[in-house]
């Protein structure tokens, strides 16, 4: 079990079966699903969907391919999920994605969670480049990434399907040399062997 924390209002912890009900309760919202991408995020979202995702995340982590975390408040309440995918060890890059339950929006939890994940990616995984793709309508997420030092690298026309229409995506990236966060962030329980580190 990995835990990533600081003195922030949230901490990250590896997903576990006990998170299923909280994930389902927070994910079962059309606006949350739309922000993630409805082509691979079901709506409605039930406990069985959460269980399937936790199982998938556990397998991908064991194979050293992805790392997904619950975003928890200091009292343990799970408010969202974020993770690393498209992990390219040879080129030391990945893509991140995240969502927060709607009732927890606009509290800074997403920002702090991404800060924790950046430290994990750049230091624990020795990545050089971290990317995020944000749908064109998601101005809040764009602002979050820009505020953390990500740079926009361009618009991807008709990036994702939404019903019979297509949504543009915007690519954001941060390079390790531009990473400036000096907060004291602790990573407990991580085994770098799982991710092919030397």
Segments and roles (model prediction):
Residues 55-70:
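A short helix-loop-beta-strand connector motif used in the catalytic cores of GNAT acetyltransferases and
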Residues 33-56:
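Conserved GNAT-fold acetyl-CoA-binding loop/helix
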Residues 1-31, 68, 73-198:
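Acyl-donor (CoA/ACP) binding surface of acyl/acetyltransferases
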Residues 27, 36, 61-62:
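Hydrophobic residues in alpha-helical segments
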